[in-house]
Amino acid sequence: MNLHEYQAKQVLRSSNLNTPRGIAATSADAAADAARELGGEAWVVKAQIHAGGRGKAGGVKVVTSIDAVRSVAAALLGKPLVTVQNAPDGQPVHTVLVEETLPIARELYLSLLVDRASERVAVVASAAGGMDIEQVAHATPEKVLTEICDPLLGVQDFQCRALAFALGLGGDAYKDFCRLLPQLYRVFVANDLSLLEINPLVVTTDNRVLPLDCKMSVDDNALYRRKALADLRDDSQIDAKEAAANAANVNYVALAGNIGCMVNGAGLAMATMDLIQLEGGAPANFLDVGGGATPETVAQGFKIILLDPNVKAVLINIFGGIVRCDVIAEGIIQAVREVGVEVPVIVRLEGTNAELGRTLLAESGLAIVAAESLTQAAKFAVEKAA
């Protein structure tokens, strides 16, 4: 789950970390009031969406008058902002962050993330901040520095010093950085984050180090114990189908194909998608209804899949281990009738009471195709979606 920039900075401030002074606003007048409260002669107005590339898309503006703050906020609020990192129709801007400007001398990059290879937290830094770090890593990988953290010790002093020297920091900036990095690590661990990215981390003209921007992603699997963070979820920033899946407590990822998939188990779901590709088709989604699938979750799955207008067929692949296939078959029949499914439905059942489940489907009087194998199911789905 992603946080907005203003929310991420609130998390930092709650841990006694310094950030630029800023106020979130949901209206143009509130933005103008925020600028007055902050004082000064210039402000930055930032659109709050869950995507990078806001600056190039016109979502970050430096202005020098209260009237300009109001007009920029009015131009952003209530409208979608399209960037290189989001969908073609963009994401809606419901909030802007009005911040003080800073006298910037240098822009750096700093992030903490889960490194899957080492199964530890990695600190990634670069002197080439303020730009797309992926491009920097691709074109000049030597400019990207990485330190792997011991989970028992966290970020150690020698690692802070090594990164600070490599980034060319000295004096107060060096001290600030070496204080900041262990604090960020503690924030990362204490909040079950999967990503904490500061781009840019700026060095000011008076040699202070501050996070000018901040992105946080919380591990979805830890939200049950991070209620304060879970309450910050903004479903307007994610795909409508994924928002519905969150509400139904099923795992859904939208894809670009036209064959809807509903499977119990993530591994089986990926194998199903692979077979669809091998048969020349393209899955429209990843949807895992879980090992303990019920008729209710099957009905919810249908509703979520059919929110995608590109879906031309639905493939259901259920292995009856914990759950009985006849119970799932009854749920499928109920869901098809309830939802009013108008696209072909192909079902592959295997496991406990699979034969009884297939019999129930055959006797339902509905246009449901019962496949004998996963390969056959994938082939039928591709043919029906063509």
UniProtKB/Swiss-Prot annotation:
Gene expressing this chain: sucC
Role according to the record: Succinyl-CoA synthetase functions in the citric acid cycle (TCA), coupling the hydrolysis of succinyl-CoA to the synthesis of either ATP or GTP and thus represents the only step of substrate-level phosphorylation in the TCA. The beta subunit provides nucleotide specificity of the enzyme and binds the substrate succinate, while the binding sites for coenzyme A and phosphate are found in the alpha subunit.
Q: Give the family this protein belongs to, as stated in its UniProt record.
A: Belongs to the succinate/malate CoA ligase beta subunit family.
Please give the PROSITE patterns that the UniProt record associates with this protein. ATP_GRASP (PS50975), SUCCINYL_COA_LIG_3 (PS01217)
An example of a GO molecular function for this protein is: ATP binding
Q: In which pathway does it act?
A: Carbohydrate metabolism; tricarboxylic acid cycle; succinate from succinyl-CoA (ligase route): step 1/1
Biological processes per GO annotation: succinyl-CoA metabolic process; tricarboxylic acid cycle
Annotated ranges, domain ATP-grasp: 9-244
The UniProt entry's coiled-coil ranges are none
Print the keywords alphabetically.
ATP-binding, Ligase, Magnesium, Metal-binding, Nucleotide-binding, Tricarboxylic acid cycle
Tell me, how does this one assemble? Heterotetramer of two alpha and two beta subunits.
Q: What is this protein called?
A: Succinate--CoA ligase [ADP-forming] subunit beta
Q: Which reaction does it catalyse?
A: succinate + ATP + CoA = succinyl-CoA + ADP + phosphate; GTP + succinate + CoA = succinyl-CoA + GDP + phosphate
**Binding-site residues for substrate, renumbered to this chain:** N264, G321, I322, V323
